[in-house]
């Protein structure tokens, strides 16, 4: 069990709200939580929060984690994929596995924690966050975010 996994069930209620504005056209506000206000004041924690805000500005995720994807959205996309003509000739159980893989790929770009980390694409945002948990010795949770782009409505 890694350090990050051991700390994963600990309560993270402190932290900070980080904001980032890119070229006056894209704005991001993100809530990043940790266990103590001491860690929230550390430069490493502040840097993590800032880098996550930059990630959100650059990559436009819709959800923090897979758990945040609404069931209706998941079912809608799954139904579209299942209706694909290229899957019609495949056996049922093979179609299920193919669709599961396609679903994972479809949502990987929309889920912040699954995205390739922009400053080191050899790891995901989730892996980068786990490294910070191990380094800082506390559970860290990216709770929520809002991304606003000039001239673009939701």
Q: What positions do the PLM features span?
A:
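N-terminal assembly/interaction segments in proteins that build large macromolecular machines
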Residues: 1-154
């Amino acid at each position: 069990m890694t350090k990050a996994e051991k700390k994963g069930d600990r309560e993270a209620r402190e932290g900070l709200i980080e904001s980032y504005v890119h070229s006056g056209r894209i704005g991001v506000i993100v809530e990043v939580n940790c266990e103590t206000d001491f860690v929230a004041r550390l430069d490493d924690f502040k840097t993590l929060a800032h880098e996550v805000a930059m990630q959100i500005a650059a990559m436009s995720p819709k959800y923090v984690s897979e758990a945040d994807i609404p069931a209706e959205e998941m079912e809608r996309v799954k139904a579209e994929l299942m209706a694909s003509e290229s899957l019609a000739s495949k056996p049922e159980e093979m179609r299920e596995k193919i669709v599961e893989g396609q679903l994972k790929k479809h949502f990987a770009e929309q889920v912040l924690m699954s995205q390739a980390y922009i400053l080191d694409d050899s790891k995901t945002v989730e892996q980068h966050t786990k490294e910070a948990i191990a380094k800082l010795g506390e559970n860290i949770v990216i709770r929520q975010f809002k991304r606003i782009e000039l001239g673009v409505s939701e």
